[in-house]
């Protein structure tokens, strides 16, 4: 927070609580129908299609769908359709999941057209009330985040995660996941109270860093790295806790900053162990989601379902990043060279 008050980025991040409440209030009838649509389709394969923050939500969707539904899920590169004009064959039993805030980017629209023409069921998760992407979709799940004024997406990203979780819960008829989502507003309220000032201090003069996650927290790492770049001018690279061991760990020397998100699931112990090893080796390690010896341990919301925990974690990130941006003399609401709606071919 600056002397002039909280940034729009921070205000809108905290509005994610209202988004979670709105989804629980407004979406159940639609979610029930969409869940039945997907069960009737009985997809053999899921393809995600998105850009930017929405593509990080797609990373989350891949993990959750493969864990909860047992369906292989892969990311589609929009340029395959928009630039190279690939014609898909036999997508009749495929769920094509497009995720977008605005639904305006031409490459996503062309990709949805191509997938639907090949027989896929195109389900778009959108924040915009109406858009060209909606017109090319078989069905739409609204994020209901409302207008977002800050260039950096916050509540719409959190809303995307929760909308995906709601969809998967209905599709798989998962009582544990449905119950966890009922508590999502409370989880986000708790996240609003997290104090990550130690993280701001530790990253104040950083130029390069790694952001590490695995499984349910890889999407959190990806989104965090993007926000570090666009609002703080930090060259942050998101990487899996497994992938970093296949070479990239070589640049982690004494004092190298690493932010680690430890998941609250089966992957947690391996990620916490890596964080401990990096700290022991002299890296400046910041951890959210666990207590790691030798690291700066940020507070987190304990006891959350692994599908809900990422939404709470990224809310804490947004508040920290907004404060870090201001502390570095920048404006988190107006990143250089960026616009709210980005259209790519």
What residues fall within each predicted segment?
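Active-site phosphate/pyrophosphate-binding segments
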Residues: 4-44, 139-257, 267, 328-345
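Generic C-terminus detector
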Residues: 304-345
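Glycine-rich phosphate-binding loops that contact phosphosugars or nucleotide phosphates
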Residues: 40-189, 214, 249, 254-257, ...
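Composition- and surface-driven signal marking solvent-exposed, interaction-prone regions
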Residues: 224, 271-274, 313, 336
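Tryptophan-centered motif/residue detector
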Residues: 20, 60-63, 196, 317
